[in-house]
């Protein structure tokens, strides 16, 4: 019987600034595809046609204890679709073998929402920041598994750029 890898420790970096002890949780982007069913003559059913990423495929959210600091506010309404650099670093461990793996997700995008939550004197406060990303790179123990760059039309999975030929076909 095997045990799953569980997140034991994590950190979040925003524009290179560490949120150790402040970041509380991270919801990493769901990598979802836009699929459209197609059913042509002679087909007994439909087949999903892959039209790239869903519109919200690279959305993420993270929460922190307390009120956001100046680093977060400085990036609010920043110019550029990749103006907000975020890095998640996680240490996952299996409890049966003790094996640990480093998981890193590098993202760039724009802050969509800064929710400072409800403030009550003498009680814990939490803020949430939503970011719509245009860049996503997932590595595990230094091995790149997925890299998506929507602006530069790059989509690599295990080192294979699945859009390389498409870029050539349209002169890029």
From Swiss-Prot:
Alphabetic keyword roster: Late protein, Viral contractile tail ejection system, Viral genome ejection through host cell envelope, Viral penetration into host cytoplasm, Viral tail protein, Viral tail tube protein, Virion, Virus entry into host cell
Subcellular location: Virion
Cited InterPro entries: Tail_tube
Entry keyword Ribonucleoprotein: no
A Pfam match: Phage_tube
Its job: Forms the virus tail tube.
Family to which the UniProt record says this protein belongs: Belongs to the P2likevirus major tail tube protein family.
Name by which UniProt lists this protein: Tail tube protein
Native species: Escherichia phage P2 (Bacteriophage P2)
Lineage: Viruses, Duplodnaviria, Heunggongvirae, Uroviricota, Caudoviricetes
């Amino acid at each position: 019987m095997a045990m799953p890898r569980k997140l034991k420790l994590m950190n979040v970096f925003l524009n290179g600034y560490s949120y150790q002890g402040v970041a509380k949780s991270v919801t990493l982007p769901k990598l979802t595809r836009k699929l459209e069913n197609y059913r042509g003559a002679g087909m007994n059913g439909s087949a999903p046609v892959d039209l790239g990423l869903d519109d919200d495929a690279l959305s993420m959210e993270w929460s922190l204890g307390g009120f956001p600091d100046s680093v977060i506010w400085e990036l609010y309404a920043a110019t550029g679709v990749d103006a907000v650099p975020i890095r998640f670093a996680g240490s996952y461990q299996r409890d049966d073998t003790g094996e640990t793996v480093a998981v890193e997700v590098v993202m760039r995008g724009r802050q969509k929402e800064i929710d400072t939550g409800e403030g009550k004197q003498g009680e814990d406060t939490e803020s949430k920041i939503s970011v719509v990303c245009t860049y996503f790179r997932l590595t595990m123990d230094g091995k790149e598994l997925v890299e998506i760059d929507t602006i530069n039309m790059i989509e690599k999975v295990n080192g294979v750029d699945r859009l390389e030929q498409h870029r050539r076909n349209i002169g890029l």
